[in-house]
Amino acid sequence: MVTTHNLGFPRIGAQRELKFGLERYWKGESSRDELKALGAELRERHWNDQRDLDLAPIGDFSFYDQVLDMSFTLGNLPKRVQGFHGDVLDNYFRVARGRSAQAADEHATCCGGVSAGEMTKWFDTNYHYIVPEFHADTNFSLDPSCLLQQLAEARALGVAGKPVILGPVTYLWLGKAKDDSDRLALLPKLLPVYGALLDTLTAQGVEWVQIDEPILVTELDAEWRQALRTAYAALETRRIKVLLATYFGALGDNLTLAASLPVDGLHVDAINARDEVDALVRELPADRVLSVGAINGRNIWKTDLNATLDWLEPLAKQLGERLWIAPSCSLLHVPVDLASEQKLDPEIRSWLAFALQKLDELNVLATALNEGRDKVADALAANAAAIDSRRRSPRVNNPAVKAALARIDAQLGNRASPYTQRAPKQSARLNLPAFPTTTIGSFPQTADIRQARRQFKSGALDEAGYRAAMQAEIERSVREQESLELDVLVHGEAERNDMVEYFGEQLDGYAFSQFGWVQSYGSRCVKPPILFGDISRPKAMTVEWITYAQSLTNKPMKGMLTGPVTILNWSFVRDDQPRSVSCYQLALAIRDEVLDLEKAGVRVIQIDEAALREGLPLRRAQWGEYLKWAVEAFRITANGVQDDTQIHTHMCYSEFNDIIASIADMDADVITIETSRSDMELLDAFDSFRYPNEIGPGVYDIHSPNIPTQDHIVGLMKKAAERIPAERLWVNPDCGLKTRQWAEVIPALTNMVAAAKTLRNQVQ
């Protein structure tokens, strides 16, 4: 019999219950007990949703981030959060976001609260984790209480499950040494704590534990490979069965290593690396389980179940009970339930599968393998019809778009003149001071904005009323910025629910859901649009709003667009053609918008590429091809404008030291980046690379409610000036201010502008 299991389930709830519960708690509108009760309610619901599985995940739920959970399980807390009042949950949120719900945190430091933990991308996904912090003297101590609580809850519900934990080597690999120490030097201190955790689970009668080591799909040097051997040799003596889980790609040159580790089972990503399975069957010892990720855990298209069975059936005959099947990775990266999508186009809806539907697909596969295809003939026939419908649909293919792609040539991505010739023309047109100030684009999405949007979508507010409401919010943003004396303004994006979905709603070839939310970090959720067909722009998307905002002020107003690579990487993308082709289609559509903004008199146009880096393949050997088409797509989008039009781009959550040459090749006049959480460490790239254009290193962390001081910002900018000539520096926040409140934004920007004025006085 084939065993079914799942690596992880979305934790936010089908209606984002966790998001709203967290935000109520942080605002002091609910108690700690109420938040914990909500967590228990969601876990119970999700385990019930997974009852048909042979083994459901336990411990995959988190109030913020699973890596942060592991840090607390291992007793690895930053010293700056120690000594505060409150319980473990308070300290947990202090690390995650700089403060808890405790009022005492308001005055803990000069900024209020403490410095939040650094946040970065989880491998090549749009999920973000809190980076573990290490020092040479870091010690670990086990606190399994959270995991044991979830285990007890699952057992009380009669759930057959397996605890899920992050592996010791991946945990170290994901972290950052805050001194010059070697993270791997901590492995001898870390392994006994992991051993104690496994012993604790054994004492609880746990048979299987899932240990995630996704670094096995990355390029590892000899030291990290040896660390994996050392770790699992040390843990082998425990009396618990270990399923070692890998995902997000092929094992590649780590295949033999993974197959040889002394564990009881190995899970592999059979979506991205199906061709490795035969080799694993040969190399795995005869007593080991092989779990294949046969359902795509990162995308929302239905699985071709008949084709998958054609592949799985010989494997099941060969392996028998040693074969397990599961999604390729945790379902954290897909929405919860397609059944909620009653307004989605029925044809497109028939092509999709969210988390619950993927579990249904898994059960169909298992039934077919264990009892024969006849037992699920109706389900297989319905699946085949949906797959064929999508393949044949004329809505997927647009000959005009394909013809436009064929006309792309090398010249399309080139500016008329190099930056050195453009910069004086832009300076003359814009007349900006030294250390010019700006923001990244969005301002707070207030309750009034959200209410107006809901009323407009429901029909309770007509188009004229909605336009008037949005114009009022835009005017408020402009007046606030003028009062703050910012130099280059933005319209605030009141009309946009999301920086990607907003454009997806207006492009042919896209569909959008009502409840297709996935977690980005903490309480932050995104609703990726669905890129199902060839992309084109029927009409202008932003010109009306930007020109209205510009009419309110004499200061430069930035046109705000999301770039093609970010739209691609933050969408659920069709899987029937190369991603590069879809990206070029997006580039042509956004290019038309750039040119329309310029024709309307917009002098500064920002094209956000926040997700450029996250699209990088996990293996460096594959980076070149991706960067070639990603950079080319940006250049096609941006480079049709005149020399005196200033092009900005923005990148957030990105470590870009290793791709700085490609970023320079994008040839944006100004790049703004996230740097504050890393204390300007991201600028280390400029020690060895002379970045030719202008740059705005983010000077305060918008993901934390803490207010930066003027002196703190001045200090950060002085660090930046050690690497970038002062005449090419801008002063700006890390990212957009959509998720903050005006009461936080105004004092933070006041201090930022004051810091810029101080810097100007110091360089005169």
Curated annotation (Swiss-Prot):
One of its GO terms (biological process) is methionine biosynthetic process. L-homocysteine binds at I440, G441, S442, E493, D608. Its cofactor is Zn(2+). SUPFAM superfamilies: UROD/MetE-like (SSF51726). Binds 1 zinc ion per subunit. L-methionine binds at I440, G441, S442, E493, D608. 5-methyltetrahydropteroyltri-L-glutamate binds at R16, E17, L18, K19, K121, R524, C525, W570, E614. The active site is at H703 (proton donor). It catalyses: 5-methyltetrahydropteroyltri-L-glutamate + L-homocysteine = tetrahydropteroyltri-L-glutamate + L-methionine. Its EC number is 2.1.1.14. It comes from the Bacteria. InterPro entries: Cbl-indep_Met_Synth_N, Cobalamin-indep_Met_synthase, Met_Synth_C/arc, UROD/MetE-like_sf. Coiled coil: none annotated. One of its GO terms (molecular function) is 5-methyltetrahydropteroyltriglutamate-homocysteine S-methyltransferase activity. Zn(2+) binds at H650, C652, E674, C735. Pathway: Amino-acid biosynthesis; L-methionine biosynthesis via de novo pathway; L-methionine from L-homocysteine (MetE route): step 1/1. It holds the Pfam family Meth_synt_2. Catalyzes the transfer of a methyl group from 5-methyltetrahydrofolate to homocysteine resulting in methionine formation. Belongs to the vitamin-B12 independent methionine synthase family. This is 5-methyltetrahydropteroyltriglutamate--homocysteine methyltransferase. It comes from Burkholderia ambifaria (strain MC40-6). The lineage of its organism: Bacteria, Pseudomonadati, Pseudomonadota, Betaproteobacteria, Burkholderiales. The gene is metE.
